[in-house]
């Protein structure tokens, strides 16, 4: 029995375990950026902004996440102080920390918050690209992209438990400056961890290296699989989601306190950690196409469950269950993105696919926020479920088995 459990553990070598710890540490620190979000939302609600306007604010602040391929190109083409990843990681973590401290200094104007929070997001988005590049570069040769991403997202959702519990208290007491101050500490943690854990050989900016990278980019731009996967991810994530609209429903219709809403977020995050733990061994044993189909089905069922979201008990049950299955769904799509990345330009093209993913999520939340204002909660749930289900009809066009086979062949080279 013990031997069977050991075989389920995907990280069998010391090097793989070191990388897993590194990714977990950096992603945990990154996840703490979301600490002020609930307090920002309730502060704007107190100021009279609608759900759609709040969703628009968060869309503005996440613009840096939509141009992530630019950061990948910079990192792939232009080494900083002789390194493609580590030097940039130190610089971007410092930027995020500085902007967070400026936000903590006070002032709750819409424009000021949007500017500084967007700049903080720029530092974190660039950091995310660099860490994802390390994940693809080290994970694909070992067949561990799915397992590494499980560790990354388990770490983020572990931090989300803290965000949910502490963020609920901060929102309840309207302590926005304190929320920013706490969030600003964690990019500093990322900076110290990068200094200690990232081992990267020098990569001088030679002309031939730039030419090779540019040739790889041009070849990848003509790769059908990359663009089909990008379109598929965009379609799936676009379906109108709840986002800030759910908080308005929880507050205005159900009368939940901000503390209880924060607790729901923490419980959902704990379930997401469990979902990531389930996906790690599944990703090495179940064909990805089957996982994608299963992910879409459970996303539809999970969305429809929100029709029963009527009181505290149903909220706890639905948020916990959807937290777990939602994590499995998300990881299946991120695993597909990692396996579709062309070799040699991993930072650029994984960032491209993640920008598509993040862009779809933001469009989804803005659309969902305005639909909630216009048609209400129940029609929003039904529309979201129907569009999610439609993604099943696109699966055959993706040719997922071919993408998996090519990723395996690339790893063997």
Go through the PLM ranges and name each one.
Residues 103-104, 189-198, 382-413:
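Multi-pass alpha-helical transporter architecture, strongest
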Residues 289-333:
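C-terminal transmembrane helical hairpin of 12-TM major facilitator-type secondary transporters
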